[in-house]
């Protein structure tokens, strides 16, 4: 079940979704329709159809390797083997557009940066559910190789792009900035910037390497393969891997509409089964996964195989270590991978993310975070039963990265 992804333009996407006129920041348009209860019924009407069938799996994705399980499950026919029809995945360029389309029911299974469903559910009342982690790690901070920035300590007075305000990239970057005594700010790029300030701006991942090479920005933090593309195609230098700051952190998660999870439990379980199987296969076959994803293979990602293979595999001290490398790896004892695969949503990570979001500079109204309980988010947003059932079929936690022995872990963060 391979083939080029169906590329949806912004105008086509909004027309399909029935939400023409929304701004790019309009994640929460459904809030104006009456909160979570009304949002649930809207989802049921637009995305779910009848309650007792097995609808086609409709996947939207950003062209990053975070989407690997969704795309490999489609390419390898894992959805079909679960008895589900899967439409050709649709490539979307920006997180705003993808989140809008998911809310509107254009897609019933997608990946989102884990802070986005937190925002959707608790700021906007949209009934999203996180059914699995898509991966761990897989992001980095990239700067110009011929520029003055040699480490994250040199980011003062600089313009750094993030893919989205509600992203692990923004959260981890600001943790790093604070550790160096730098203040993250959000302001116009033309405004004066103090030496101890770093200006953050949102940019779609596909635009980042070009912006770096032309000098429009000083650096970016984003998912792969845009860091590998920056290295190979845009004169970039990786100065820190996010997985070397927060060991095996989640980033993108697989999400469904809450109505589907409750009313279509069999469909939801089958879809998660396919994702977990794809994660295990991808962990054990990274070179082949890179080929399939690349434009030299099934064409899901608009990059040649060598770029995606580098993004998934290259993680050596000679290139990235402190002694003689770029310094992107400072904790080799963690034995991390550039991308790791483990589908279970550890409660400790969810709780720490909520805690960190409360300290992160974000654009827009963040009042919902003030009284948001990390424990409540871990209980309410995550659906654990589906992935636990799937893990039972595919070797348990021991068959995945981290080789965790049970469903609890301690978060390790060392900036």
Please give the residue ranges for each predicted region.
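Conserved C-terminal helix/tail region of periplasmic/extracytoplasmic solute-binding proteins
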Residues: 349-415
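Short, glycine-/small- and polar/acidic-enriched structural segments
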Residues: 24, 44-203, 211-214, 218-248, ...
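Extended low-complexity acidic/polar segments
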Residues: 2, 16-17, 209-240, 313-318, ...
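N-terminal secretory signal peptides
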Residues: 1-12, 20-27
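Bacterial lipoprotein signal-peptidase II cleavage site
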Residues: 33-42
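Secondary-structure end/capping motifs
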Residues: 262-372
């Amino acid at each position: 079940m391979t083939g080029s992804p169906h590329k949806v333009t912004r105008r086509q996407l909004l027309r399909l979704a029935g939400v023409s006129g929304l701004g790019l920041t309009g994640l929460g348009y459904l809030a104006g329709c009456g909160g979570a209860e009304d949002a649930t019924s809207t989802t049921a009407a637009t995305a779910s159809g009848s309650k007792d069938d097995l609808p086609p799996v409709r996947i939207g994705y950003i062209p990053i390797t975070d989407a690997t399980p969704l795309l490999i499950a489609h390419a390898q026919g894992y959805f079909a083997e679960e008895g589900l029809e899967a439409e050709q995945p649709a490539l979307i360029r920006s997180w705003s557009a993808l989140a809008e389309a998911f809310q509107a029911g254009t897609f019933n299974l997608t990946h989102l940066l884990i802070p986005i469903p937190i925002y959707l559910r608790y700021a906007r009342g949209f009934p999203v559910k996180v059914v699995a982690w898509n991966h761990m790690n897989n992001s980095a901070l990239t700067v110009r190789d011929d520029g003055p920035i040699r480490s994250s300590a040199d980011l003062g007075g600089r313009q750094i792009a993030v893919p989205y305000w509600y992203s692990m990239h923004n959260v981890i970057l600001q943790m790093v900035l604070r550790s160096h005594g730098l203040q993250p700010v959000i302001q116009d790029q033309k405004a004066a910037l103090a030496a101890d300030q770093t200006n953050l701006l949102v940019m779609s991942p596909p635009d980042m390497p070009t912006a770096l090479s032309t000098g429009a920005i000083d650096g970016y933090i984003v998912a792969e393969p845009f860091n590998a593309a920056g290295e190979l195609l845009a004169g970039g230098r990786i100065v820190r891997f996010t997985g070397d700051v927060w060991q095996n952190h989640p980033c993108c998660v697989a999400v469904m509409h809450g109505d589907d999870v409750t009313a279509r439990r069999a469909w939801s379980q089958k879809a998660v089964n396919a994702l977990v199987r794809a994660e295990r296969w991808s962990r054990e076959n990274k070179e082949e996964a890179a080929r399939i994803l690349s434009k030299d293979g099934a064409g899901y990602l608009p990059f040649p195989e060598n770029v995606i293979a580098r993004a998934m595999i290259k993680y050596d001290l000679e290139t990235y270590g402190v002694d003689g490398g770029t310094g992107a790896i400072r904790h080799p004892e963690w034995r991390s991978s550039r991308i790791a695969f483990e589908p279970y949503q550890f409660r400790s990570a969810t709780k720490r993310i909520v805690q960190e979001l409360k300290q992160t500079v974000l654009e827009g109204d963040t009042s919902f975070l003030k009284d948001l309980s990390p424990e409540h988010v871990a209980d309410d947003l995550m659906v654990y039963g589906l992935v636990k059932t799937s893990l039972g079929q595919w070797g348990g936690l021991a068959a995945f990265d981290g080789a965790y022995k049970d469903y609890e872990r301690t978060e390790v963060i060392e900036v």
